[in-house]
């Protein structure tokens, strides 16, 4: 009755012999924070930038250890947990471009805020989530899509924003090689647009993306 259990899994493609691919993979942890309680799930996607397959394997092992340690010691502080994931890894070796944390111990956590923290703390350049609020892995969600992006502050979204999108989409459909059923419209917010006096307000961020 004092034991807590976890199960770790990953599926990874590391750099091949000819270095014609990009190392990346999925890592998942199912874990309890208290004995005899329902488990939580943490899933993340990583991109490995080391130019050597052995180095990629070592980096992956390090991030796996950091993930387990961080969830058991820093789960009370999401930003501290996120920053701990790259402990012991040199800058730029691994990118974490998606992280999802769900379960009874994390019902108060909004995964969109975790996505924003990944970008804010330099673990990735961009994060993506759908209109339902679920976080997405960008390269998977946008594979073979024709992408139309509208950048703005969206505080709030205005008729001007919508008119720009409408006219842009109209012209975009006329482009050669555009398959209409593969068009994906994205709204883009930058960290600069979110910052107020150098600080990002979480409620303001959620109000805009809602």
Name each model feature, range by range.
Residues 1-210:
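Nucleotidyltransferase catalytic core that binds NTPs
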């Amino acid at each position: 009755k004092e034991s807590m259990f976890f199960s770790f899994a990953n599926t990874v493609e590391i750099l091949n012999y000819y270095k014609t691919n990009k190392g990346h993979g999925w890592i998942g942890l199912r874990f309890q924070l208290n004995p005899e309680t329902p488990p939580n799930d943490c899933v993340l996607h990583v991109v490995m930038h080391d130019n050597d397959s052995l180095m990629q394997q070592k980096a992956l092992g390090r991030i796996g250890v950091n993930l387990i340690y961080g969830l058991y010691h820093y789960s009370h502080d999401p930003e501290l947990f996120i920053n701990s994931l790259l402990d012991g890894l040199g800058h730029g070796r691994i990118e974490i471009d998606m992280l999802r944390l769900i379960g009874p111990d994390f019902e108060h956590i909004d995964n969109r805020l975790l996505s924003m923290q990944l970008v804010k703390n330099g673990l990735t350049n961009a994060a993506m989530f759908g209109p339902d609020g679920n976080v997405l892995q960008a390269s998977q969600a946008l594979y073979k899509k024709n992408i139309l992006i509208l950048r703005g502050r969206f505080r709030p979204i205005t008729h001007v924003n919508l008119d720009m999108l409408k006219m842009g989409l109209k012209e975009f459909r006329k482009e050669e090689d555009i398959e209409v059923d593969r068009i994906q419209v994205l709204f883009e917010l930058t960290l600069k647009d979110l910052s107020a006096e150098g600080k990002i307000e979480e409620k303001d961020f959620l109000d805009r993306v809602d």
